[in-house]
């Protein structure tokens, strides 16, 4: 029960919750705290009204996800302390907030994402990973699928001939398969190249993208998205 229901007197009005409201999203980051996700308890008001009273307890996103879906994006960016708190909730159905042991109705579907190659991330413990079934999602298998993604996600402000879109996507995919690169461009690179080449055309007063627009956009779009392997950086630097 939530604090309102627990301390209510008499009948409580019911409210239907839509599917969208049952989907709770949490964005992982190093500064995310246990209080952000689990909730916070005001110690002074807790002494007066009780730790789970409406006055003392501020529910976090995990509490709001009960009987719904908790989607945690970039879980491995969350600090270790928060990961341990989540583990306690998933395993025991309760959590420690401050100096209080709180019973949580942890009845939700927990979905999380992570990019194992990213920097500035925390290692997920084997115990926490054991709570998940893991699905590895790679890049689009074929060029046609990637082109559809670029068209669906990219903003359109000028006409892009089909052959130029094919060139952009093919170029990005060729870099992705380059054995000399340690860091390769994602699908976002294709979307950025698609949008940047259009911007170049519009600034030049044209309504259709040319191959020159694509070429001029390549460096600003691709340069920071690729990186040579360390051994090759050393050799090429000599």
Can you annotate each of these PLM segments?
Residues 1-121, 132-135:
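Conserved ASCE/P-loop NTPase catalytic core
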């Amino acid at each position: 029960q939530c604090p309102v229901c627990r301390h209510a007197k008499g009948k409580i009005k019911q409210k239907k919750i839509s599917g969208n409201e049952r989907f709770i999203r949490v964005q992982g980051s190093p500064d995310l705290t246990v209080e952000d996700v689990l909730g916070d308890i005001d110690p002074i008001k807790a002494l007066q009204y009780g730790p789970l009273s409406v006055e003392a307890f501020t529910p976090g996103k995990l509490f709001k996800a009960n009987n719904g879906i908790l989607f945690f994006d970039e879980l491995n960016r969350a600090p270790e302390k928060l990961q341990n708190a989540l583990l306690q909730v998933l395993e025991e159905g309760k959590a420690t907030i401050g100096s209080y042991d709180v019973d949580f109705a942890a009845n939700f579907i927990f979905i999380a994402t992570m990019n194992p190659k990213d920097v500035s991330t925390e290692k997920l413990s084997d115990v926490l990973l054991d709570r998940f079934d893991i699905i590895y999602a790679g890049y689009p298998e074929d060029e046609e699928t990637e082109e559809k993604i670029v068209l669906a996600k990219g903003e359109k402000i000028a006409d892009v001939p089909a052959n130029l879109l094919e060139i952009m996507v093919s170029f990005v995919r060729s870099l992705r398969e380059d054995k000399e690169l340690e860091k390769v461009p994602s699908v976002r690179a294709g979307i950025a190249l698609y949008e940047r080449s259009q911007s170049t055309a519009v600034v030049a007063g044209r309504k259709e993208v040319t191959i020159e627009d694509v070429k001029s956009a390549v460096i600003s779009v691709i340069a920071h998205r690729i990186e040579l392997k360390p051994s090759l950086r050393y050799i090429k630097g000599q």
